Amino acid sequence: MSSDKANNQSPDQGANTPAESTNSGPKLDGNQAVNLAAEQSKSTADKNLPVFGDLPIPEDTANLRFGPNLHDGLLALLPLVGVWRGQGQAAHPGEEEFTFGQQLSIFHDGENRLGFESRTWKINPPAEEGAEADGDEASAESAGEPEVGELLRREAGFWRIDNDDNIELLIAHSDGMIELMYGKPLTERAWQLESASTLATETGPSALGPGKRLYGLMPNNDLGWVDERLIDGEMVPWMSAQLKRVRG
């Protein structure tokens, strides 16, 4: 199945969207890629994925300073490497729009591929103020603070790219769908992909059609992304988020 998809909205009011903040630019240069990644990671340079320490093969790393060298074929994807965390908005058909939290880990093992894992969870609205009226001090203290709700979908897979910068994104969705997306870098700080094939299991999502994703680094070096899906014959917003680098 194939799909079309539109532009992105940033959850951070006042910030440009990834599409707006990553206008066309020169083809990626190795030194530029390293410099951009270094600027992004000044406060997270000493942090990385947990490691086992006794594997006889290279460990996965989300920090370009540790572990094996990044494969030369991945330069166009280099700025994505890291662990990113933040919040976003989801608008699923038949449901009210809700806020979710996300951790997105993008890592490598020295081979010509990136691995990734995404975890999301629902963020419930803050408890109503005045909870102390019920005599619950703990509730009163947490009034106004958002609460972590149910766990949502997980994704895992791989980013691959060839010598002509054609990207393949292979995604396994925890709710019972496998997806292949193709795309290209828009600039050295933005990447756009769209579904080439989706396969749902018998218990997987029957209404979720093919989609299109845009990932982009914003002027503040946050990673923004947006996903739209073909639902009932038209492309509609599905999920979008703005994530800060926390490791790498």
Swiss-Prot record:
Superkingdom, taxonomy of origin: Bacteria
Disordered: annotated segments: 1-49, 118-147
Intrachain S-S bonds: none
Signal peptide (residue range): none
Biased composition (Acidic residues): 129-139
CDD domains linked: lipocalin_heme-bd-THAP4-like (cd07828)
Bias type Polar residues, positions: 1-25, 32-43
Pfam families in the cross-refs: THAP4_heme-bd
Motif GXWXGXG, residue range(s) on this chain: 82-88
Matches recorded under Gene3D superfamilies: 2.40.128.20
Family as reported in the entry's similarity comment: Belongs to the nitrobindin family.
Protein name: Ferric nitrobindin-like protein
Record lineage: Bacteria, Bacillati, Actinomycetota, Actinomycetes, Mycobacteriales
